[in-house]
Structures are given as structure tokens and as C-alpha cells.
Regions:
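Alpha-helical transmembrane segments of multi-pass small-molecule/ion transporters
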Residues: 1-305
């Protein structure tokens, strides 16, 4: 299956679930307060379990070198993303925290996993886990403090000891020591972790119900953030890592992951911190639509280099 078809399929699936969430909100089935409670379930239970369960897989020493390269390249990419977002998005802007967060963090799981699997198979997915691991560490430290607009030590400790960050390190220990959960417990936790994508889409759809679509489309910063997230960042990052002696597949996996649309985590953080979840939903929705054009283009450019 071609990259374009895989991307289009994932976007359609995502928007169908999002529309269900929007309908539930319009009909009063999900209230504003209810959506806040759902976001807590997603952030503090479902997402950590998804991270932990991703490490319940077979260890392969043959692929360890590629995985280490993926960690390094992913770290460079995130470093570039954070630096550029800080430089290009002024702190004087009233919603700079939402814009910076949306510019850095991508939907690398739901879009990235099926896309990478369709192009590079299971080996590509293994390399993607490095990017997703760093995503979860950074989104719960840098991302958390960016959205909360707090840099104090107490906030850092709270972010660094969040369930998702703990899940990363516990999952890595289980993976390296090849500790497997009993079948019944594994199946039970897998069912809960599988809720991550539909639950996140329902939350985003419910938040989108509060959005003035016509007003949103007139916001030039929405397009600027999307252009940065979908095209500028991945190209700049790829140019920086292009000459490193890493396997080409690893470079492409990191490129595609960084070029995925805006993460839904921003909407859930915005709900928790009483920011503007509607604006985050706008970033998510528009970037997801535009990624149907930009992702194939970025992928082709990467393959040509």
C-alpha cells in the first residue's frame, strides 16, 4: 500500500471518530466538564498504559544499533523543534504556549505507526518507538511546563514524575530484561491502552464543537503554525541529520514522525490548564487535513536525498 493511501486512510478514520465526538458534544452527551474528566482518564491512565504496553515485545540485538541511532536523531529533531518554536513564536503573543506546543509535538502514534508500518514494515515501527519514547518524555516535561507557563522546580518534578514518564522507564526496564506480563493481565491492559486513539479523537471532537470554524480559518497564525509543523521543521531537521552515518530507514522514520500533524495531547493539556482547547483543536484539525498533502511531499523529498 502506497504512503499516500495509508495517510489518507488514517486521516479519514481520525475525522470520523472526531465527528462522533463533535456530535456527542452538540447533543449534550459530553459536557464541557465531562470532556475535562475524559481528558484526565486519557492523560493519566490510558496514555501511560499505551506507552508501557508498547515495550511488551521481543528484544532484538540486531536492531539495537538502529534503535540507538533513532534515539539520537529524534533527540536532535526535538531540540531543533523546541529552539525554532521559541525563536519564531514570540512570548508576547497571548496564546504563545498553545502555538509553541502545537509546533513541536506531532501525532506520531496514530498517524505515524500505520504509516511507517505500511512503508517500512515492523523494523520501521521499532525505530519509531524511539521517537515516541522521547515524545512522551518531552511532552510531559517541556510540553507540560510550556502549556502551564511555569518553569519552577516543583512543576518540573511533577512533570518528570507523571504517569507517562514513569511508564517510559518502567517499560524500558521490562523490555531490556524481557519481563512479560501474565496473559490475562496483558490482555486486560492491552484493551485499555487500545482506547487511546478513539478516546483522544472523541475529546478533540468535543472540544471542536466549541470552535467557530469560519473565524478559525481567518487566523493567519493557524496556517503559520501548520506550515512550520508540517514542512519547515521536518525539512530543517532532516538537513541537519542527513550527513550522519545513520541507516537511511532510520532517517526517514524520524523525518515522517516529525512531519505528522499536531498532537491531540495539546487539546487535553489545554482543557486541564483552562487554556483554549478550541484553538488547539483548530491546530489539530487543519494540520491533519493539510498533512494529506504535505506528508507525501516530505516523504518524497526525503527519499530523493
Amino acid at each position: 500500500m502506497g504512503a499516500g493511501v495509508v495517510i489518507l486512510k488514517q486521516i479519514v478514520i481520525m475525522f470520523i471518530i472526531l465527528l462522533i465526538g463533535l456530535w456527542c458534544s452538540l447533543k449534550g452527551l459530553i459536557t464541557k466538564e465531562g470532556n475535562k474528566q475524559l481528558s484526565k482518564v486519557a492523560l493519566y491512565i490510558v496514555n501511560p498504559l499505551l506507552i508501557f504496553m508498547s515495550y511488551q515485545s521481543e528484544y532484538s540485538s540486531k536492531l539495537l544499533k538502529g534503535l540507538m541511532w533513532s534515539f539520537l536523531l529524534s533527540g536532535i529533531t526535538f531540540g531543533v523543534a523546541i529552539a525554532l518554536s521559541t525563536l519564531l513564536i514570540s512570548k508576547k503573543r497571548p496564546e504563545h504556549s498553545l502555538e509553541r506546543f502545537s509546533a513541536v509535538y506531532s501525532n506520531c502514534g496514530f498517524i505515524g505507526i500505520p504509516l511507517i508500518r505500511g512503508i517500512y514494515g515492523d523494523e520501521g515501527v521499532l525505530y519509531l518507538t524511539a521517537y515516541i519514547t522521547l515524545f512522551n518524555i518531552l511532552v510531559w516535561t517541556h510540553g507540560y511546563m510550556t502549556m502551564k507557563e511555569s518553569r519552577d522546580f516543583k512543576s518540573f518534578i511533577k512533570a518528570a514524575t507523571s504517569p507517562s514518564v514513569i511508564a517510559v522507564f518502567v517499560g524500558l526496564i521490562f523490555y531490556l530484561m524481557q519481563i512479560r506480563l501474565p496473559e490475562i493481565l496483558h490482555t486486560s491492559l492491552q484493551y485499555v491502552s487500545d482506547m487511546n486513539t478513539p478516546l483522544a479523537m472523541l475529546i478533540a471532537g468535543s472540544a471542536a464543537a466549541q470552535t467557530n470554524v469560519l473565524k478559525a480559518l481567518k487566523n493567519k497564525w493557524l496556517y503559520m503554525v501548520c506550515a512550520y509543523k508540517l514542512f519547515l521543521l521536518p525539512i530543517v531537521a532532516f538537513a541537519l541529520v542527513h550527513f550522519l552515518p545513520a541507516p537511511h530507514m532510520v532517517k526517514m522514520v524520524v523525518l515522517i514522525a516529525s512531519a505528522c500533524p499536531v498532537a491531540t495531547t495539546g487539546t487535553m493539556f489545554a482543557i486541564q490548564f483552562d487554556k483554549n482547547p478550541e484553538r488547539c483543536s483548530e491546530f489539530f484539525a487543519v494540520s491533519t487535513l493539510l498533512s494529506g498533502l504535505t506528508l507525501p511531499l516530505v516523504t518524497m523529498l526525503g527519499e530523493m536525498l
